A protein has these predicted regions:
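Short, glycine-/small-residue-rich phosphate/pyrophosphate-handling segment
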Residues: 122-170
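Cofactor-binding loop segments of dinucleotide-utilizing enzymes, especially the Rossmann-like FAD-
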Residues: 9, 143, 181
Length: 208
């Protein structure tokens, strides 16, 4: 039995396009994976620890082979606990709206909290980084209100998908699927794209 963790980066609840497409994906997944566990994680639920001075100092201490102390130790434990919650799953679904050409800051906060040496990555001065997440796969739902790949620069740029795809591969997760719905506000026939995105999510969910 596998565990699929859905991480939602949209704070818009029932009005969220990315969450609606994710629901279609998950319904299809349940049909073909009836014994698997599905866990929901709303990244806006207040459970993410902050990643401030103590956490940054703890990360560098661990990088240097030292043990964090005091506030740094507490921040490090919070990072480990957050990572373990993520690592408990072997399949991931991210629903990610575009914010200002990139990802919502809550998703960046999540990434900053768990991207720690010995947890998500290893590092060798000669050979560089090694992703430590093995035997995992991820699907990502990308939505945008205005940006579209065939629209001009006045409609924005995409630092959303390149960033998250690169981070996932950096962690060691290179079995990736993506469903895109864009744009949903700047296109007269948005319903056509919406239906196509839900159909793609349904197909991807069944095969995931």
């Amino acid at each position: 039995m596998s565990t699929l963790l859905h991480l939602s980066a949209s704070p818009r609840g029932a009005a969220s396009e990315s969450r609606a497409i994710a629901a279609t994906f998950l319904d299809a997944y349940r049909e073909t994976h009836p014994d698997d566990e599905i866990v929901e994680w709303d990244l806006w639920d207040g459970s993410l620890p902050e990643f401030g001075p103590a956490a940054a100092a703890a990360k560098m201490a661990v990088f240097a082979g030292a043990d964090p102390q005091g506030d740094e130790a507490r921040a490090w434990r919070n990072a480990i606990d957050t990572f373990r919650r993520f690592d408990a799953a072997d399949r991931y679904l991210f629903s990610v709206p575009m914010w200002n050409a990139g990802v919502p800051y809550i998703l960046k906060q999540f990434i900053d909290v768990i991207s720690q040496p010995g947890l998500v990555f290893g590092f060798d001065p000669e050979h560089g980084y090694t992703g430590l997440l093995e035997d995992k796969k991820a699907a990502v739902i990308y939505t945008s209100a205005v940006y579209g790949p065939e629209r001009g620069p006045a409609f924005g740029a995409d630092f959303q998908r390149p960033f998250l795809d690169d981070w996932l591969r950096w962690t060691g997760i290179d079995d990736l699927a993506a469903i895109e719905f864009r744009p949903d506000l700047a296109t007269p026939d948005a319903d056509t794209g919406r239906r196509a995105a839900h159909a793609a999510a349904r197909d991807a969910g069944k095969l995931f």
